[in-house]
Curated annotation (Swiss-Prot):
<keyword id="KW-0967">Endosome</keyword>
<comment type="similarity">
    <text>Belongs to the VPS35L family.</text>
</comment>
<keyword id="KW-0653">Protein transport</keyword>
<dbReference type="GO" id="GO:0032456">
    <property type="term" value="P:endocytic recycling"/>
</dbReference>
<dbReference type="GO" id="GO:0015031">
    <property type="term" value="P:protein transport"/>
</dbReference>
<dbReference type="GO" id="GO:0005768">
    <property type="term" value="C:endosome"/>
</dbReference>
<keyword id="KW-0813">Transport</keyword>
<comment type="subunit">
    <text>Component of the heterotrimeric retriever complex.</text>
</comment>
<comment type="function">
    <text>Acts as a component of the retriever complex. The retriever complex is a heterotrimeric complex related to retromer cargo-selective complex (CSC) and essential for retromer-independent retrieval and recycling of numerous cargos.</text>
</comment>
<protein>
    <recommendedName>
        <fullName>VPS35 endosomal protein sorting factor-like</fullName>
    </recommendedName>
</protein>
<dbReference type="InterPro" id="IPR029705">
    <property type="entry name" value="VPS35L"/>
</dbReference>
Length: 942
């Protein structure tokens, strides 16, 4: 439509803002509304509610005395607690919290053996029962009990050899289930025999390194047996609550007799070890015979004396552990535990006779591994001794000093005694460790245990320096790098938490020196990393740590790139989490730049997006925290340095551009030199960013910033660069979920944004009238859109809006200090003619889009575009010109053809919009109003 004569008409009405009328509301407008529908069956309405008897029962409950209810609830809870209490109420002494750790710690690859008669069909076995036939002589009763316990069918004994650890554990689980099943089948003696056979196995130390786990498995079965006996006796003693007092007393007497019978049976066992373990397994049953704490203590002392007959110190130690474990459930006395330790210290030298033997035959078990077998037993016994009582702590420590080869006991003391006691006697402990020479227990092990204790509870303030010096005198004498680094790993928490930065720096320096010898650091990356992590976790200021002379040399120990990168990530993560203040310290900044450069250099073509994103986020955090106050030039210099350092990370470049733009807004001087420097920095940085979208957005941002600060030349350069990138924009991008996402919506939004900005951009004398708009239209014309896309039509329509604004005498908005085209041209007729010509070109482009949509059979989109152009012709163009008026009518007819595909309200609303325009201008411009009225008549008549 080359002969189209477009003439923009002046706006002859005032734009008014219509305020939205408010309305009071009692509910939040975004609150979700829920409707509850109750649907009931009419036939069942008569049965709703509760029956009268239930109502009476409820009323009786409600009328109960509240105190009576409280008493009944308390009694119920007390009974439940008593029923469930098989271990000490204090979680510290509960064995169940330790058993899993023992099973995981003490394992073996050796083959195990097991001898039992209860994992085969036992039809020939006499299950027996717990009742004993009435005998007239006590000797006959004893003989009968022995016959019951000795009645093992030798032919049924099964020796299982070459079992793996897992198979061995499964066999014990089967034995446990067999015991439970026998008990519930009223085969009490069979259950007792299973328990005896299991207890006998505790004398077997063939596979030494598995003995603690073997002890756990067997005592689990003994615990089950003891619980079954106790529960049966308790059920007998409780009786029927409704029975008379005499009946209840007879039942309690019968329970006492049965209990005594169980202890007589166990006392008849000939071998010491199973007799000892079985009596302890039902030790809780002494409650039915006596409630005296003194009696319990007397029994425990008797059992302690029996243990003097066990020769093997390992078997003896775990038997004492079982004794203590059962004793703490009934008595809080510590006397029997102290006596056990007195006996233990007597047999303690025997342990090292075994150690000397294993030193000659390390293929069996090493001395260190053998001594570790005692740790669970010693630890638990010591813990029970000092729990809620420090009566014997000093005595144990004094006896420990007198012992030769006291390392094993000292290890357990450090792991079991209260940290407060250890902290109070810290110098005494360090002297004891320095003097200790125990085969199998190295000083590094003792020092690690002591370091863990003082990290949670430090020594007195005046003793700390002396204590630390004494400790590190010993640590620094360790020649094995593995022992040295393991010690320092534990002590790093103590040093960083309770000492100044100078001690931390000295520690890092000593580590640098020791680990560089023979490149020892190559084998200890994990420990070195843990040391650094613990220091950062416990020291107060990460910035103060970064400026220490030995900090960056410490990082040089991590020569392996993957470890080095992980360490740098860790440091920057701690800086991100624990540094809330800005920094301008040059040393801190250089350290952060050094860390960031390591991360930046690790990024390559094979790096995944998540890795890039994580690294960029860490670097961006410290870039934001580097702040030089009012020294803006120094801040910009830092950004320049950062740009050269982090060349592999687009996200960092985006952050730097935004930071430079923000820096430009802080300029308070009247000179625009610094702002120009910031814009120039951004203009140079943006092309290095790979993503075209981000480049376009940043160019537009920088152009708007330059325009606001009256840097017109730089603004023009930014806008031109942004428009030149449009044809490099890909058609689609990949979303986070892997699906392709079209970029046409982004392009439409971007073009609308830039058109709104170009309204106030003055024309450059070198480029001609409306250069940027011409460039925009040219770029849009070259861009490849989808065939059925509405994106170019929307851009052209908004371009028409922008051109109409250019024809106005006064633009709707301005930027202070910028001479826009309304002031620059002063409504010059030549300028208006250029605007009208461009409007005609834009309309021609829209008409071509209409034709393309028709060819593509997109009638709905075609009709909507026709109506949009129709309204703009009515608003902006001179309808007195016949070509314009006829074009408007043709557009209406085109839209009317697709009426069936449009919303029913679309056409009527369009006509109402034309009527509103007519009402707005009829007083100010009657002639133009008359042309609109004629157009309405032609439209309605068509």
């Amino acid at each position: 439509m080359a002969n189209l004569e477009w003439v923009c008409v002046p706006r002859c009405y005032e734009v008014r803002k219509n305020c939205l009328t408010g309305q009071a509301t009692l509910e939040h407008p975004l609150k979700q509304r829920t409707v509850t529908v109750v649907d009931s069956n009419p036939l069942s309405r008569a049965l709703e509610g509760t029956d009268p008897l239930s109502q009476f029962a409820r009323q009786d409950d409600e009328l109960n005395d509240p105190l009576s209810q409280m008493v009944s609830e308390f009694d119920l809870k007390s009974k439940r607690r008593e029923r469930d209490r098989t271990e000490p109420e204090d979680n510290t002494l509960q064995w169940s919290s330790r058993r899993l750790g023992i099973l995981n710690r003490f394992t073996t690859n050796e083959k195990l053996s097991l001898s039992t008669s209860f994992l085969v069909s036992s039809g020939s076995l006499d299950g027996g029962n717990e009742s004993i036939k009435a005998q007239t002589v006590v000797a006959d009763k004893t003989k009968f009990r022995l016959e019951q316990l000795d009645h093992f069918d030798d032919g049924s004994m099964r020796h299982m050899m070459d079992l793996t650890q897992q198979e061995y554990i499964q066999r014990f689980e089967q034995l446990k289930q067999e015991l439970i099943q026998s008990w519930h089948n009223d085969q009490r003696v069979k259950a007792l025999k299973i328990a005896i056979q299991c207890a006998k196995m505790l004398a077997d130390t063939t596979v030494l390194q598995f003995y603690p786990s073997q002890y756990v498995l067997i005592t689990d079965i003994l615990d089950v047996f003891g619980k079954l006996v106790y529960e049966r006796l308790r059920a007998k003693a409780s009786g029927d609550p409704a029975a008379s007092a005499a009946t209840l007393e007879r039942e309690r007497e019968a329970a006492r007799d049965t209990c005594q019978n169980w202890f007589y049976k166990i006392a008849s066992i000939r071998e010491l070890l199973p007799r000892f373990y079985l009596e302890l397994s039902i030790f809780k049953c002494y409650e039915f015979l006596s409630s005296s704490r003194e009696e319990y203590e007397r029994i425990l002392q008797r059992l302690t004396h029996q243990l003097r007959g066990i020769a093997d110190p390992l078997v003896s130690s775990y038997a004492r552990c079982y004794l203590v474990r059962m004793g703490v459930t009934l008595t809080s006395s510590k006397t029997y535990i102290r006596e056990n330790f007195a006996d233990l210290f007597l047999i303690y030298p025997q342990i090292f006779r075994f150690v000397a033997r294993f030193n000659l035959h390390p293929e069996i078990v090493t001395a260190s591994s053998y001594l570790q077998l005692y740790a669970p037993a010693f630890d638990y016994m010591l813990l029970c001794l000092v729990h809620k009582s420090e009566l014997h702590t000093q005595d144990i420590l004094n006896e420990c000093k007198q012992l030769k080869n006291n390392g094993a006991i000292l290890m357990s003391v450090l792991s079991s005694f209260n940290s407060e006691f250890i902290a109070t006697n810290a110098l005494e402990f360090i002297a004891l460790i320095n003097a200790s020479e125990t085969p199998g227990i190295s000083k590094s092990q003792l020092l690690r245990s002591l370091g863990s204790c003082v990290s949670s509870c430090p020594p007195l303030q005046e003793q700390r320096v002396t204590f630390l010096k004494a400790a590190f005198e010993t640590i620094n004498k360790l020649t094995d790098p593995n022992e040295y680094i393991n010690c320092v790993e534990t002590w790093a928490v103590f040093v960083s938490q309770y000492f100044t930065i100078h001690e931390v720096n000295r520690l890092l320096g000593e580590l640098n020196t020791r680990m560089c010898l023979g490149k020892a650091y190559e084998k200890h990356y994990s420990q070195l990393q843990n040391i650094l992590t613990r220091i950062m976790q416990n020291y107060r200021s990460i910035e103060l740590l970064l400026i220490q002379p030995n900090f960056l040399p410490y990082l040089d120990l991590f020569q392996k790139e993957s470890v080095r990168v992980e360490v740098c990530k860790n440091i920057l993560s701690f800086y991100k989490q624990n540094s809330d203040e800005y920094t301008c310290d040059a040393v801190v900044t250089n350290a952060l730049m050094y860390l960031g450069k390591i991360l930046n250099d690790s990024v390559n073509a094979l790096s995944v997006d998540d890795e890039r994103r994580q690294i960029a986020q860490l670097i961006n955090v410290f870039i934001h925290k580097v702040h030089f106050g009012n020294d803006l030039e120094q801040q910009l210099s830092f950004y320049v340095e950062a740009r050269g350092t982090f060349s592999n990370l687009d996200a960092v470049y985006v952050t730097l551009v935004h930071a430079a733009c923000k820096l430009a807004t802080r300029n308070r001087s009247k000179s625009t030199g610094f702002v120009k420097a910031c814009i120039a920095y951004c203009f140079i940085t943006i092309p290095s960013i790979e993503a075209v979208q981000q480049q376009m957005n940043l160019y537009l941002l920088c152009g708007q910033l330059a325009l606001q600060h009256l840097c017109l030349g730089q603004a023009d350069a930014c806008f031109e660069a942004a428009l030149q990138l449009v044809n490099e924009l890909p058609a689609a991008t990949v979303d986070f979920d892997g699906k392709p996402r079209s970029l046409e919506p982004f392009l439409v939004s971007y073009m609308c944004n830039i058109l709104a900005t170009l309204i106030v951009v003055p024309d450059s004398p070198e480029q001609g009238v409306l250069y940027f708009l011409r460039l925009l239209l040219e770029v849009v014309g070259r861009h490849k859109f989808k065939v059925d896309s509405s994106a170019p039509s929307i851009i052209y329509l908004h371009s028409l809006d922008m051109l109409y604004v250019q024809s106005l005498e006064r633009f709707p908005y301005h930027i202070k200090g910028v001479v826009s085209n309304d002031d620059l041209y002063g409504h010059d007729p030549k300028f208006l003619q250029e605007v009208n010509n461009m409007c005609a070109q834009v309309v021609d482009a829209i008409l071509l889009q209409l034709k393309s949509l028709g060819v593509a059979q997109q009638q709905r989109s075609q009709a909507e575009l026709a109506l949009e152009l129709f309204l703009r012709i009515v608003k902006y163009a001179d309808l007195e010109r016949e070509t314009i008026a006829q074009l408007a009518v043709n557009l209406w007819l085109l839209a009317n053809k697709a009426q069936s595909q449009l919303d029913v309200k679309t056409l009527p609303q369009t006509l109402r919009s034309v009527e509103i325009i007519y009402k707005q201008i009829k007083d100010a411009s009657p002639i133009r109003a008359q042309t609109i009225a004629k157009l309405l008549l032609r439209v309605r008549s068509s």
